[in-house]
């Protein structure tokens, strides 16, 4: 008879300790220690078997990549799904994870690949009703409602010759009989994910795991979950906005930082093949406090609108708020504007927003942000049909930007005829206005 053991585990890094503490001694995160009851029926095996070595220069098995019918998903994955790979998709509740996975498993992809959709959150009838709403009933995709790990693996094993792709929605609902802890705990997620990923790799099956996120946007469960899989994707978006962005944060078979853009509608997720044009649709010219940033997301050029609002404040410490951009970087740009060109906004509230619910981490967006702030502060719009890109240093100088030619081509394709950026080498166009300092930018917006 086994005896249940109690221990405390960090939900961030998975480190265990015999006593509770307010801070994890391994990763240093506060408030991440939770109590778990662990019961195991496995006997400890101390013997092993000899394994054969291989040479680094030996034969490499071909990694067969299978394109999906969803082009934006192919872009993020690096061209398609790789046999034997494990993919983790995280996102807020209701953002569209299950919709995307069901559209993949029940599309014409199912006519080429044998797909199994396993749900632990819905009944089979609920899945069928959602498939009817999304018009996905023409394809004979297998579905299974199960939450027990051993039952799932046994079901796949019995039909493994007829299964190429398995979708698990979601990993937080799966439990193993080896543990007495409830579903969604760190130990359950770690063991279940590890068993599923190992089984998929041993049998050359593609597995897609849907994952919940915490209130601060992190994947729920131990960090080791992200290390177990080959690819980590985040589904981003605002429930008040119909745009969704699928972004890769880890990819062993492709690039990191690639994005796919979708539009959520009544019939499911629709691909947005030209997001720049969609995000700038019906935009008015000569609007004070707005500018267009020519950005790069992964390998994709993307034009985004930057909006700024400046109002007088009676507070001792005026508010600075940024949506879709780093608030600390906004404070830095405001300090540089005050120090280098005398634009003092100490007694004003400053609000910055990226239109369309997008998030920008590209440092080349500094120049577009500065242009919006100068426009909002002076009451004068930026030049018509202009785009901005360039990183601002603490001295007020505009630094060179990577992939400048790609940004320029995207802007010209969408009808912009004035490019305001840092000085470029080997690129001489009449419509490029090079700026080397914030003083030059201030002269343009006047």
Swiss-Prot record:
Its EC number is 3.6.4.-. One of its GO terms (cellular component) is cytosol. One of its GO terms (biological process) is recombinational repair. The keyword Nucleotide-binding applies. Keywords: ATP-binding, DNA damage, DNA repair, DNA-binding, Hydrolase, Metal-binding, Nucleotide-binding, Stress response, Zinc, Zinc-finger. ATP binds at residues 91-98. It holds the Pfam family ChlI. The keyword GTP-binding does not apply. SMART domains: AAA. One of its GO terms (molecular function) is ATP hydrolysis activity. It is an enzyme of class 3 (hydrolase). A motif (RadA KNRFG motif) lies at residues 250-254. A zinc finger (C4-type) spans 10-27. It comes from the Bacteria. Residues 349-446 are annotated as: Lon-protease-like. NCBIfam families: sms (TIGR00416). PANTHER family: DNA REPAIR PROTEIN RADA (PTHR32472), DNA REPAIR PROTEIN RADA-LIKE PROTEIN (PTHR32472:SF10). Belongs to the RecA family. RadA subfamily. DNA-dependent ATPase involved in processing of recombination intermediates, plays a role in repairing DNA breaks. Stimulates the branch migration of RecA-mediated strand transfer reactions, allowing the 3' invading strand to extend heteroduplex DNA faster. Binds ssDNA in the presence of ADP but not other nucleotides, has ATPase activity that is stimulated by ssDNA and various branched DNA structures, but inhibited by SSB. Does not have RecA's homology-searching function. Has a putative N-terminal zinc-finger, a middle region with homology to RecA with ATPase motifs including the RadA KNRFG motif, while the C-terminus is homologous to Lon protease. This is DNA repair protein RadA. It comes from Rickettsia felis (strain ATCC VR-1525 / URRWXCal2) (Rickettsia azadi). The lineage of its organism: Bacteria, Pseudomonadati, Pseudomonadota, Alphaproteobacteria, Rickettsiales. The gene is radA.
């Amino acid at each position: 008879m086994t005896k249940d053991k109690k221990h405390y585990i960090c939900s961030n890094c998975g480190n265990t300790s015999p006593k509770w503490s307010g801070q994890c001694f391994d990763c240093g995160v506060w408030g991440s220690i939770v109590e778990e009851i662990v019961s195991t029926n496995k006997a400890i095996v101390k013997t092993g078997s000899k394994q054969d070595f291989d040479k680094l220069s030996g034969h490499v098995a071909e990694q067969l990549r299978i394109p999906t019918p969803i082009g934006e998903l192919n872009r993020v994955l690096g061209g398609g799904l790789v046999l034997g790979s494990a993919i983790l998709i995280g996102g807020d509740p209701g953002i569209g994870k299950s919709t995307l996975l069901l559209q993949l498993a029940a599309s014409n992809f199912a006519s080429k690949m044998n797909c199994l959709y396993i749900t632990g959150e819905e009944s089979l009838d609920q899945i069928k009703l959602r498939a009817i709403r999304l018009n996905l009933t023409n394809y004979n995709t297998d579905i299974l409602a199960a939450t027990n790990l051993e039952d799932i693996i046994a079901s796949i094993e019995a039909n493994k010759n007829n299964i190429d792709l398995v979708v698990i929605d979601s990993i937080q609902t799966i439990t193993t009989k080896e543990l007495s802890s409830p579903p969604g705990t760190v130990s359950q997620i770690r063991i279940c994910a590890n068993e599923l990923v190992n089984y998929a790799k041993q049998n050359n099956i593609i597995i897609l795991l849907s994952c919940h996120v915490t209130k601060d946007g992190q994947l729920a469960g131990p960090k080791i979950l992200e290390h177990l899989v080959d690819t980590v994707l985040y589904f981003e978006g605002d429930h008040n906005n119909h745009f969704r962005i699928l972004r890769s944060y880890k990819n062993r078979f492709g690039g990191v930082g690639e994005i796919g853009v979708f539009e959520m509608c009544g019939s499911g997720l629709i691909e947005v093949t030209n997001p720049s044009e969609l995000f700038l649709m019906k935009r008015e010219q000569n609007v004070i406090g707005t500018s267009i940033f020519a950005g790069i997301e992964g390998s994709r050029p993307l034009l985004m609108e930057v909006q700024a609002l400046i109002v007088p404040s009676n507070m001792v410490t005026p508010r600075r708020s940024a949506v879709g951009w780093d608030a600390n970087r906004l404070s830095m740009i405001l300090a540089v504007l005050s120090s280098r060109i005398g634009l003092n906004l100490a007694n004003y509230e400053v609000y910055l927003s990226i239109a369309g619910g997008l998030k920008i981490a590209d440092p080349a967006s500094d120049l577009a942000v500065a242009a919006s702030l100068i426009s909002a502060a002076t009451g004068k719009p930026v030049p018509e049909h202009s785009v901005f890109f360039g990183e601002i240093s603490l001295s007020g100088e505009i630094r060179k930007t990577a992939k400048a030619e790609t940004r320029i081509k995207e802007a010209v394709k969408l009808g912009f005829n004035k490019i305001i950026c840092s000085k470029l080498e080997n690129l001489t166009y009449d419509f490029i206005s090079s700026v080397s300092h914030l003083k030059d930018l201030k002269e343009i917006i006047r």
